[in-house]
A protein has these predicted regions:
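N-terminal intrinsically disordered/low-complexity leader segments
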Residues: 1-17, 207
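Hydrophobic alpha-helical connector segments
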Residues: 63, 67, 80-108, 165
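Helix-turn-helix
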Residues: 21, 25, 29-63, 67
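Amphipathic alpha-helical packing segments from all-alpha helical-bundle domains
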Residues: 104-115, 126-152, 162-166, 197-204
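Hydrophobic/aromatic-rich alpha-helical bundle segments in the mid-to-C-terminal region
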Residues: 150-198, 207
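Amphipathic alpha-helical segments used for helix-helix packing
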Residues: 79-86, 93, 106-132, 143, ...
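Short, basic, alpha-helical segments at the C-terminal edge of helix-turn-helix-like DNA-binding modules
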Residues: 40, 69-76
Length: 207
C-alpha cells in the first residue's frame, strides 16, 4: 500500500509567499466566521497548504492574529505624524496632523480594528497582550503630542499636560473612530474634521 503524499501548489513558492497566503486566508476567514469559529485546518485548506505548514510558517491561531494586527501597530502614518508634530510650531497644525495620522491608521486597518477586534474580540491572553501593547503605544504617542502642545504653551489654562493626554485619548483614541465611523456610520473625512475641531476646542487656549 502506498501513502499518497500531500501536494501543495505553494510548495515551490517562497516562504514569504506561503506566509502571506496563510495570513490572507486567515484574515478572510476571521472576518467571515469570527475568530473562535475558524480552525487551523480551514486556514490551511483555504491557503492550499498543509496544516503543519501553517504552524511552521506563522504559528497557532493567536500568533496568526498577532501577525495580522502587527501592521496596524507599526503603520508608517504613526511615525510620520509624530515627526510632523515635533517639527510644527502651530498648535492647531499639531492637532490636525495627529487627527489625520490616527484617521489613516484606522482607515487602512478598519476591517480588523472594527470588524474583528471591536465587534467580536478574541479572548486569548496572548492576543489581549498584543492589544494592550498597542493601547500603551497609542497613549505614548499621544503623550508626545501633549508634550509638544505644552512646549508651545498652547494648552488652555485649566488643562494640565496629564489632562491633555486624557483629552487627546478621548477625542483621538480608537473609541472615537469606532463610535463615529463604525456605530454612527460617519465617513472618515467627516469624523476627522469633527474630531480635530473638538480637540482644538477642548485643549487649546486660543481655539
Amino acid at each position: 500500500m502506498t501513502t499518497r503524499k500531500y501536494h501543495s501548489p505553494l510548495r515551490s513558492r517562497s516562504a514569504t509567499a506561503t506566509r502571506e497566503a496563510i495570513l490572507s486566508s486567515a484574515h478572510t476567514l476571521f472576518l467571515a466566521k469570527g475568530y473562535p469559529g475558524v480552525t487551523i485546518g480551514e486556514i490551511a485548506e483555504t491557503a492550499k497548504v498543509a496544516v503543519p505548514t501553517v504552524y511552521s510558517s506563522v504559528g497557532n491561531k493567536p500568533k496568526i492574529l498577532t501577525a495580522l494586527l502587527e501592521p496596524a501597530l507599526t503603520d508608517p502614518a504613526i511615525a510620520d505624524s509624530l515627526a510632523a508634530v515635533a517639527a510644527s510650531d502651530d498648535p492647531r497644525a499639531v492637532i490636525e496632523v495627529t487627527a489625520e495620522g490616527t484617521r489613516l491608521t484606522h482607515e487602512r486597518h478598519w476591517d480588523l480594528v472594527y470588524g474583528l477586534f471591536y465587534r467580536n474580540p478574541p479572548g486569548e491572553p496572548a492576543v489581549k497582550a498584543v492589544l494592550d501593547r498597542g493601547a500603551d503605544d497609542y497613549v505614548q504617542a499621544l503623550t508626545r503630542v501633549a508634550d509638544r502642545l505644552a512646549a508651545l504653551d498652547a494648552l488652555s489654562a485649566d488643562v494640565s499636560p496629564a489632562e491633555a493626554v486624557d483629552l487627546l485619548w478621548f477625542h483621538l483614541g480608537p473609541h472615537a473612530w469606532i463610535t463615529l465611523v463604525g456605530e454612527r456610520e460617519w465617513s472618515f473625512d467627516r469624523a476627522r474634521a469633527w474630531i480635530a475641531r473638538a480637540a482644538c476646542r477642548a485643549l487649546l487656549q486660543d481655539h
